[in-house]
Amino acid sequence: LHEAFVLKRQGVELGNNEMEDHIKVTIFDTEKELLRAVFDRMLDYPFIITFNGDNFDMPYLYYRAQRPEVGISKEEIPIVMQRDAATLKHGVHIDLYRTFSNRSMQIYAFGHKYSEFTLNAVSEALINESKIEFDGGIGDLPLYQLARYCHNDSRLTFELTHFSDDLLMKLLVVVSRVGRMPIDDVS
């Protein structure tokens, strides 16, 4: 949870390291090294929790890894792409975007505290925290600021599963058990 991986790119500055001491930033020279490290880290956890990971993060990682200049084979990628979701070969992927955009969760579980289904809107409404704002494009950020931005998004995503005595995870487990469905199908 307290790591950030970034890719060194020509013409992009390092910037100032304003990360808290307990956060480790690893800067990779090649995209292949970065992706291999991400995939290795994914194997360390039984659950991978994302916010809109089905539509962005997982497909991005999956297809970038297979680009000829990167050259990671499909067999080495721990992600399995399905028609409308991403699953894992070893573990469970929970996409919180799908969970929080479920009207029953939005209205009954969380009292309609949020009306937009973005990480920022849900985080502000439920945990009173927000994404880091910046000017310009994300690709223009110096590497340490990019690491800080990405780590904050990951932290917010985790906190959404952890607040109120792990309320969301408990709800997902109960619905999964009652519906006799895998937790990644429920989410």
Predicted regions and their residues:
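Secondary-structure junction/capping motif
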Residues: 30, 95, 118, 184-187
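Hydrophobic transmembrane signal anchors and adjacent membrane-proximal interface regions, especially
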Residues: 23-25, 78-79, 158
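Glycine-rich phosphate-binding "P-loop"
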Residues: 12-32
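Common nucleic-acid-contacting/processivity interface regions adjacent to the catalytic cores
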Residues: 137-187
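Metal-dependent phosphoesterase core characteristic of DEDDh/y 3'-5' exonuclease domains
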Residues: 2-10, 14-18, 40, 47-143, ...
